[in-house]
A protein has these predicted regions:
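Charged, terminal alpha-helix-loop-beta segments
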Residues: 1-334
Length: 334
């Protein structure tokens, strides 16, 4: 992955916040990261040391995020093989996504407010089809708590996409976040949310998807009448279009095949693909535009791109999330 001007701006920003604020509780940086050019591990100021990497997450969500990832056996994005602990990389988009969305995942009103601001026809968010509900006791009463945002969403990938596994966050098509919703007509809608932060991508052959993988798994699906991809394009062999295309196919296959999650099939008639990216990341914005230009007109209408600050703007004025917005403004938005 190449490094853009925006990447270096955000790296400098995170290093400054690490040194000058209490956001990371005054822990040092200089954690280890693999230098591909030098083929060795090196220390970097914007990488938290391993024992401090949990502090990359917003403090009120840390333990619950860890429990969530452990309960659903979700892999963390990391530079090494230890995929069971969050990365110390302050520029991680997985961490960026969790810091923005995890706090509100059990609040249907908050989740609906941010989704409806982007998709006006959505009138209701539904409990996650892949996360189990929880029970808590309040005033001696048993209360059911649902999750309305799933993270690292994957579902029946071996059947739907002919992939080897369905492990959330690793070795299969996953979506950073996912909302199951209902529109004004009572139809159920799949809302995958792909999250980008400082990413920019290279088109070198070493980053190209393998022909045999695409031919076996995705090319036929992309050519079916109901697919908005309108065939597998050459540009789809490279990220991020490779990600966007596979996520589109996963949603289309869920709609077409109605796979069961537990005892019940997941029913949906349509999808809305939300891609969250900072307004300042011009490279990823250009990539999204290219993807829109390559899909069918019906597919283009189903892609919504939004800046993370704009996405969470409906929460302004909500006292429940004042501390969250203050954190996000200090760390990412200002």
């Amino acid at each position: 992955m190449k490094k853009s001007v925006y990447y270096f701006q955000q790296r400098d920003r995170q290093e400054s916040i690490l040194k000058e604020t209490n956001i990371f509780e005054r822990v040092p940086g200089n954690g280890l990261w693999w230098n591909k050019e030098e083929n060795q591990w090196e220390k970097y100021p914007h990488i938290l040391q391993h024992q401090d990497s949990l502090k990359n997450l917003f403090s009120p969500i840390r333990q619950e995020v860890m429990s969530y990832f452990e309960e659903y056996d979700i892999a963390w994005w990391r530079e090494d093989d230890d995929r069971y602990f969050p990365t110390g990389n302050l520029l991680s988009s997985q961490i960026h996504c969790l810091n923005h969305l995890f706090r509100i995942r059990k609040d249907p009103e908050a989740v609906l407010s941010i989704i409806k601001a982007q998709c006006k026809d959505i009138v209701k968010v539904l409990p996650s089809p892949i996360d189990w509900h929880e029970y808590v006791f309040e005033d001696d009463q048993k209360k059911k708590i649902n999750s309305y945002i799933s993270f690292e969403f994957a579902l029946d990938n071996p059947h739907l996409l002919q992939e080897r596994t369905c492990k959330r966050g690793k070795d299969c098509t996953s979506v950073d976040a996912f909302v199951y919703a209902e529109n004004i007509n009572g139809n159920r809608i799949l809302i995958p949310i792909e999250w980008k932060y400082t990413e920019s991508y290279e088109r070198d052959d070493e980053y190209k998807a393998k022909d045999y993988v695409v031919n076996k798994r995705y090319k036929d699906l992309a050519s079916r009448d109901y697919s908005n991809l309108n065939g597998w394009k050459n540009e789809f062999y490279w990220d991020p279009l490779y990600e966007f295309a596979r996520q589109t196919l996963l949603m289309e296959q869920i709609i077409h095949e109605k796979p069961k999650c537990g005892a019940f099939p997941i029913k949906a008639t349509d999808y809305i693909h939300i891609i969250v990216r900072p307004d300042e990341n011009k490279e990823i914005i250009d990539d999204i535009k290219q993807f829109k230009d390559l899909v069918k007109a019906e597919g283009k209408k189903r892609i919504i791109e939004v800046d993370p600050q704009e996405l969470l703007s409906p929460l302004r004025g909500n006292e429940k999330y004042k501390d969250l917005l203050t954190y996000l403004e200090t760390r990412y938005w200002k």
